[in-house]
Amino acid sequence: MKKLLDMAEQLSERYLISEVMELPEQAEDQVYYQLLKMAGKSMLEQIGEVERERLEYKEYIEQWIHEIKTPITAMKLLCENHRTDWTKELLLELEKTNRFTEQALYYARSEHTEKDYSVREMALSQVVHQAIADNKYLLLQSGMRLEVEEMQGTVYSDEKWVRFILNQLIANAVKYRTEQPVLRISTHKRQDQVVLVVEDNGIGIAASDLPRIFEKGFTGQNGRLIQQSTGIGLYLCKRLCEKLGIGITAESSEHGTAISLSFHINCLIHEVQS
């Protein structure tokens, strides 16, 4: 019995204990063994069914998001071709809607990201300006002043994912802005890394909240004051950065917040593949 308990302790899925047990010699013990086998089989079947349902739901969500992006893009083009004060407001709301659908898509994919990324050489300057273009109406409406320094060199990563991460950081800078808001984006080299810094002069993050900002659903003191805060954006940024081997850190004070993304120059591909 002790041997059996020890074996069970070593299993991460203890319902599989019957798979590693030896067939008992005594008839009475064999009955219990068969019952364990039946219970284990039933559990595996139920787990398989739940996994299939989860996968079907995930595929449905991804398909729905792709479908909804088509009318969003069409409405955006119509508004851009017929500029009025009303369509300017609508463009801002469409930009927000597109950002939320992107967030839902990446959340759905975040569990199995290895099937979706494509690591290749990319220019940081290009992806930064793409992210700014993605949020141009939000930035204009907020009165945000942009200060974008010359981006240093190229790195190896997934351009689409990095663009999504930057979109989240830009949206946060707008959400937690103060009067006369400023957003600075810069790079610098540090040993074998290129560090991309997104910095704002917003309301900042409380020191007690800073260690938890990448936790799922965590909004913090300032987040609770803003109804739009969900605690998902930075959580997704952290999760995607981990998958891509990008370091992500945050510094904050009452004068603003700086998020740093650290790209390894030489070993990023190895880290992602491992």
Task: Locate predicted features.
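Conserved micro-motifs of the catalytic ATP-binding
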Residues: 113-117, 150, 154-157
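Short conserved segments within the C-terminal catalytic ATPase subdomain
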Residues: 136-148
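Short helix-loop "hinge" at the ATP-lid/N-box region of the Bergerat-fold HATPase_c
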Residues: 173-174
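Short beta-strand/loop element within the Bergerat-fold HATPase_c
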Residues: 180-192
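Acidic ATP/Mg2+-coordinating residue in the GHKL
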Residues: 200
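Short conserved segment of the HATPase_c
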Residues: 205-218
